[in-house]
Curated annotation (Swiss-Prot), chain B:
Zn(2+) binds at residues 154-155, 158, 170. It is a peripheral membrane protein. This is Ubiquinone biosynthesis protein COQ4, mitochondrial. Keywords: Lyase, Membrane, Metal-binding, Mitochondrion, Mitochondrion inner membrane, Ubiquinone biosynthesis, Zinc. It is found in: Mitochondrion inner membrane. It comes from Yarrowia lipolytica (strain CLIB 122 / E 150) (Yeast).
Length: 465, 262
């Protein structure tokens, strides 16, 4: 029953498309152009793959069209107001920065707004066990763990690098509405845009985020689950300058504070959707107090106070005063930048494959993860690098850039690496979202062990970068 | 070299670390920092002492402290942190003494009120709020207060439930407290001490008092969150209802009835 009605509903749509195709000769002609490569999505992953393709001599002459649904005007004119920082900030690992430097992007990123950090403390909010990473001891003098960079800063740098590149078209405020393959197009993707035009292409790259339309059009499944957790982000002001990152694991999810220049900090508080909504509704003073509580008080305290917002300003200062000063806890947060609080549902999803004939997926389109390891954007950077190299190698040989044979090295390089990382992050999330005393005890032993055994720590650090 | 030690301290705090005494600083004036071994010795020693002489209040108190840490006292504090009144208690940290409670005023309160029931009970048993021992072996100052509060509230639990301080009454109350607070010491007493009962006492304890105590202890609200100083005027029956506690049958009356039957 159900199936037949869906079929009935689907069939006219198919017919309509076919009719529309067959009348293209007589009707006012919708323009169909060709682009060797079409990148859908102007996020960090999409812009990076475009910049990489325009870097290599083998691919620089390939025509590339980048289509972005949103407007890029804000990004292009985004200027350095040192009294404001964006709420979407990512920690770029040294290897991401290394590649961005190589393809000429990093020099366009505003470095006054990037904060390097060399020290990181993670601790268990239930047992207090902690692990500390210090790169000066581990990776040698002068190495950084990561670089806190606003997503806007990175995207702005990427756009600057892409400005005036040959054979590159950036279409913003344009939506990809469908993808078709017809015999006339030799089964290559025809990308239908909201401006009425169609682009035929040899390689369609989906860098179109977690709900990737390209993935859907290509019939690639993405499997995983909802964490039933929201990531609340905010830009906060700290009492003094910091060069350290902190993460405390609470039963509701981890809360992380990462340093930005000029006494700013980037907050990512993963918690229940309900609590995230409550936290967004607090007054700025209450919110600041709650963030300080979340780094210092017991989980019970935090949950009680969020449920009783009118007691935050009366009860919380007393509870905080009872805590003896703990050097591992970040310095007090003194303010929250207005309109900087936002929250995102967190999901763990992995596409069954990253490639199909004439199609490749990169970034969040291929995988999404919990932000607790700060790896989401970095994984996309790794994808872009690997895919660009695969395309370059094929172009150098004069091979078809869209064939699965060309794309396979990319999949082989990234899929299992990403899969392992997604798994580890997923297990960490599960391990730390329980209050079971036995599990708390065991995981604390684990964390203490990690903290005291140098080789284990070295291994983890080398995995993280 | 040597510090002057308050006369009341059981084990003199030594600055140097020994097998039993920890060398970490005191968290509050009466605090006696112990090592894990010290804590174990204290628990075993006071446990034996209590088993043979449960009237040694100091030993009972010590056993309670030695077994509450590190886990259970935090759980009890957590119960307080989940409740607005419990949090206020932690903030204000009121102490109960014969002065702070003004026993004469309580004697003039209306019959059946918490204050009146409490003072009548004190008078009947010949005890005073000042006989409660000071907490010294709990390391966290706030948890030490939780232990102190629990101890000082104990006499109110008697008033609330109407259980007398004879062995079975005391034990039934311990069972009630164990179910309600989760502190292991009360649980220990609840299962070990009946070994010393006469058969008739044991039967009464297991048939009537223990079931009452466990049932009511588990289902009632946490009694640690009652701000006793603020409910003195309240009717005991009403407070029992608020907390979800039934009154147990009068133990002494039952003893008399049984004696008559013989
Ligand atoms: C709370 C939170 C904190 C995070 N912290 C970190 C961190 O510290 N470190 C880190 O590495 N990562 C972090 N991440 C992850 C990181 O933000 C993402 O992985 C990254 O933004 C993904 O980039 P992307 O380019 O793949 O996708 P997106 O940034 O989602 O870009 C996709 C783009 O495609 C466009 N698009 C979609 N559909 C269409 C269509 N039909 N037509 C045209 N355009 C379309 C969208 O408009 C969008 O601009 C965090 C994520 C969250 C939620």
């Amino acid at each position: 029953m159900l199936r037949s009605t869906t079929l009935q509903r689907l069939r006219p749509a198919v017919f309509r498309v076919q009719r529309w195709n067959s009348t293209t000769t007589s009707a006012p002609k919708p323009s169909t152009t060709h682009s060797d490569i079409v990148v859908v999505g102007g996020g960090p992953a999409g812009l990076t793959i475009a910049a990489a393709l325009k870097h290599y001599p083998e691919t620089v002459n390939k025509s590339v069209t980048l289509v972005e649904f949103g407007s890029l005007d804000n990004l292009k004119t985004w200027g350095p107001d040192m009294e404001r920082f964006e709420n979407r900030v990512s920690s770029l690992t040294p290897s991401s920065v290394e590649y961005l430097t190589k393809i000429g992007v990093w020099e366009h990123v505003n470095r006054d707004r990037v904060q390097a950090y060399r020290h990181m403390t993670a601790w268990d909010g239930v047992s207090g066990s902690k692990v500390q990473f210090n790169t000066t001891q581990l990776m040698g003098e002068g190495r950084d763990i990561a670089y806190m960079t606003e997503n806007f800063n990175l995207q702005n740098g990427l756009l600057k690098q892409l400005a005036n590149k040959p054979n590159l078209t950036i279409l913003d405020k344009t939506k990809v509405e469908g993808v078709e393959r017809t015999p006339e197009s030799h089964n290559k993707p025809l990308v239908k845009l909201s401006n009425g035009s169609t682009i035929s292409t040899d390689l369609l790259i989906g860098a179109d985020g977690a709900n990737s339309p390209v993935r859907t059009f290509s019939g690639i499944e993405a499997r995983g689950w909802d964490y039933n957790t929201h990531g609340l982000v905010a830009t906060v002001r700290l009492a003094n300058e910091q060069q350290s990152a902190w993460q405390r694991f609470l039963p509701t999810g981890p809360i992380a504070l990462l340093p930005l220049p000029n006494r700013f900090g980037s907050l990512v508080w993963s918690t229940t959707p309900k609590m995230a909504a409550q936290l967004k509704q607090l007054t700025p003073e209450q919110f600041v107090m709650m963030v300080n509580c979340a780094f210092n008080l017991e989980p019970t305290d935090i949950e009680y106070l969020v449920e009783h917002p009118d007691e935050i300003m009366t009860d919380a200062p007393y509870r905080l005063s009872q805590r003896s000063s703990n050097p591992d806890v970040p310095c007090p947060i003194v303010a929250v930048q207005d309109k900087s609080r936002a929250s995102f549902p967190l999901k763990m999803k992995h596409a069954d494959t990253y490639i199909a004939e004439n199609v490749a997926l990169v970034g969040d389109a291929a995988h999404t993860t919990h932000p607790l390891a700060g790896q989401g954007l970095n994984m996309g950077q790794g994808d872009a690098q690997s895919l660009a190299i695969a395309i370059r190698n094929a172009a150098g040989r004069g091979a078809d850039i869209g064939s699965t044979l060309t794309l396979e090295p990319y999949w082989a390089d990234q899929y299992f690496k990403n899969h392992k990382l997604l798994g580890v992050v997923d297990k960490l999330h599960k391990l730390y979202s329980t209050r079971n005393p036995l599990v708390v005890g065991l995981r604390s032993l684990g964390l203490d062990a990690v903290n005291s055994v140098k080789p284990v720590k070295d291994f983890l650090m080398s995995q993280a970068s | 070299m040597f510090r002057t030690v308050p006369k009341t301290t059981l084990l003199a705090p030594i600055q140097r670390r020994t097998l039993l005494n920890g060398n970490y600083p005191k968290a509050y004036p009466e605090h006696v920092p112990l090592t894990c071994l010290g804590r174990a010795v204290l628990a075993v020693g006071s446990g034996f002492g209590t088993f043979f002489d449960s009237r040694r209040g100091d030993l009972v108190a010590t056993l309670g402290e030695a077994t509450a840490q590190p886990y259970f006292i935090y759980k009890l504090r957590e119960q307080m942190l989940k409740d607005p009144t419990g949090r206020r208690l932690l903030r204000e940290q009121p102490r109960m003494t014969s002065k702070s409670l003004d026993l004469d005023k309580l004697r003039n309160m209306k019959v059946g009120s918490i204050g009146r029931t409490y003072v009548e009970w004190l008078d009947k048993e010949g005890v005073s709020p000042d006989t409660r021992a000071q907490v010294r072996y709990i390391d966290d100052p706030e948890c030490a207060y939780v232990m102190q509060r629990y101890r000082e509230s104990h006499d109110f639990y008697h008033a609330l439930t109407g259980l007398p301080i004879i062995m079975e009454g005391e034990l039934a109350l311990k069972a009630f407290e164990w179910a309600n607070t989760g502190l292991p010491m009360s649980g220990l007493g609840m299962v070990l001490t009946p070994l010393k009962f006469k058969p008739k006492q044991r039967k009464r304890y297991f048939d009537v008092y223990l079931p009452w105590a466990l049932y009511n202890g588990f289902r009632s609200k946490p009694v640690i969150n009652v701000y006793w100083e603020e409910v003195l005027e309240k009717d005991a029956e009403e407070l029992r209802r608020d907390l979800g506690i039934e009154q147990p049958p009068d133990l002494r009356q039952m003893k008399k009835d049984m004696a008559k039957k013989k």
